[in-house]
A protein has these predicted regions:
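Conserved two-lobed SF2 helicase motor
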Residues: 107-122, 163
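Conserved pre-motif I regulatory segment
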Residues: 7-49
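Conserved helix-turn-beta segment of the N-terminal RecA-like "Helicase ATP-binding" lobe
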Residues: 82-105, 182-186
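Conserved P-loop NTPase motor "coupling/switch" region that bridges the ATPase
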Residues: 72-74, 93, 130, 147-205
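Conserved Walker A/P-loop ATP-binding site and its immediately adjacent core
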Residues: 57-63, 71-95, 169-175
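Conserved ATPase-coupling elements of RecA-like P-loop NTPase cores
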Residues: 124-126, 136-151, 172
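Walker A/P-loop
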Residues: 43-63, 136
Length: 208
C-alpha cells in the first residue's frame, strides 16, 4: 500500500467542541493573531505553536479570557516558574487580569490564575473551566510521572490550550505528548496509527 493511502485510511475529522467569539475582541491583536484566537476558541482543545516574537502570550491570554467569560468560571495557566510573573505583567499591559494561584484558595467566577508546573498537585482540576499549558514543549522532557500528572489534570477540563514557541514538529515524542494532553489520542495510539517500522536493525526506528 502506498503511504499516502495508508495515511488517508487513518484520517479522521475532529469535531469542533468550542464556541464562537464575539464579533469584536477587546485585545490589541495583530491581523494574524485574531484568527488564531478565534480558531482555538472554536476548536475547544487546540495548540498554538507560535515562534518567538509572534505574540504567543497575548494569544493565550486572549483565549483564556474568552473561555472565562464564555463559561463564567476560572481558567488556570500552567507555566515554568520564571514565566509566571512575566505572564502576569503581560496581562496588565493588555488589560487582562491574571492572578497567582494560591493553593487552598477558592476559585470562582471568570478569573484567570497562573501557577508553575510543580504546584499542579495542590489544585483541584474540577474547579476550572479551561487550562493553558505554556512552554508545552517541556512536556516531552519531563519524567513520566509528572507528564502523566499534567495530562490527567487536564482530562476533566473541557477547554484546553497548548502553547509553545519551540515545537519540534518532526519529533514524534513531542507530537504524542501534545496530542495526549489535548485528548486527541495517546502516544501509543498515535504510534500505532500513523507510524510504521522500517524493518531496520535499529530498535524503535519509525517513519511517518
Amino acid at each position: 500500500m502506498e503511504y499516502e493511502n495508508f495515511i488517508r485510511n487513518k484520517s479522521f475529522r475532529h469535531v469542533d467542541a468550542g464556541f464562537s467569539c464575539p464579533e469584536v475582541l477587546p485585545y490589541p491583536l495583530f491581523d494574524y493573531q485574531e484568527p488564531l484566537v478565534r480558531w482555538a476558541c472554536k476548536r475547544g482543545k487546540a495548540a498554538l505553536f507560535a515562534d518567538t516574537g509572534l505574540g504567543k502570550t497575548i494569544m493565550q491570554l486572549a483565549w483564556a479570557d474568552q473561555v472565562a467569560k464564555h463559561t463564567g468560571g476560572p481558567v488556570i495557566i500552567l507555566a515554568p516558574l520564571a514565566v509566571s510573573l512575566q505572564t502576569i505583567d503581560e496581562g496588565k499591559k493588555y488589560g487582562i487580569h491574571v492572578e497567582k494561584a494560591n493553593p487552598g484558595a477558592t476559585f470562582f467566577g471568570p478569573n484567570i490564575v497562573i501557577t508553575n508546573y510543580e504546584q499542579i498537585h495542590k489544585f483541584d482540576p474540577d474547579v476550572f473551566q479551561g487550562i493553558v499549558i505554556d512552554e508545552s514543549s517541556i512536556l516531552k522532557g519531563m519524567q513520566g510521572k509528572r507528564r502523566q500528572e499534567i495530562t490527567d489534570f487536564g482530562m476533566s477540563i473541557k477547554y484546553r490550550l497548548s502553547c509553545t514557541a519551540t515545537p519540534s514538529p518532526n519529533d514524534f515524542m513531542e507530537l504524542g505528548t501534545q496530542a495526549e494532553f489535548l485528548g486527541i489520542m495517546s502516544q501509543i495510539e498515535m504510534l500505532a496509527m500513523f507510524f510504521i517500522h522500517d524493518g531496520g536493525d535499529e530498535i524503535g526506528r519509525a517513519h511517518v
